[in-house]
Amino acid sequence: MFTLLEDRSRRQFLNNADILKPNLVAPGNLIWAAWSSLGTDSVEFQGENFAMMSGTSMAAPHIAGLAALIKQKFPSFSPAAIASALSTTASLYDNNGGQIMAQRAYSNPDINQSPATPFDMGSGFVNATGALDPGLIFDSRYDDYMSFLCGINGSSPVVLNYTGQNCLSYNSTINGIDLNLPSITIAKLYQSKTVQRSVTNIAGEETYRVGWSAPYGVTIKVAPTRFCIASGERKVLSVFVDAKMNSSTASYGRIGLFGDKGHVVNIPLSVIVKVTYNTTTNV
């Protein structure tokens, strides 16, 4: 059984809650790996050539190595395309077909685990084999991310410091919900919203069937529900989301694209605040 450890890095960022975090999860507990004998970080491993450690610093190298393999197979892939391949092919279940569980910060040991949500595991547990054959990818341009960053209130000095580019050169901005990510996260759903995502086929021609499970308190529809896509072709999917109750509790669903050649594309859908009517009162 896979269990996600309670960790400070396993958090949804509330400042930009329309972007799912974490993206996905990878092996990071008790990882036995090479270690510099000159390292002084841990006294117990001084002089050793191998060490066993846990944490995000152990999970990240797994993802970095797999990203390098994807780039080797698909040299033209952008960072966004690589991230998409990793996310859309991630596993939702453990090797025995059981649910991935998440540790909770409860004092009672009998209730300190529950099924993981996208806010715990992102798209799921990284699948190395699947990531090298994703079928469809969600790609984005560098300028898309720059437009998003420049649209964050007060971000201009930070963007200039880290990228050397002035936000004044970007005439329009992009909201987090509109980035072409392999996930959909809506922080505040007022009545209804339409979200679009574009997919690009990096495999052979294939026909996809679209299925979904809606988050609690929400109804969704996806158009088209079936499409044929040629190699290299791009298709736009429209996701219509409607609130059916007033709630501030996050709920989760998924959209799946099922290809007739065996490709399966997994898209987590999360909605936090749901409002079915306009609560603004004129005085």
Model-flagged regions — what are they?
Residues 1-283:
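Loop-rich non-cytosolic ectodomains and luminal regions
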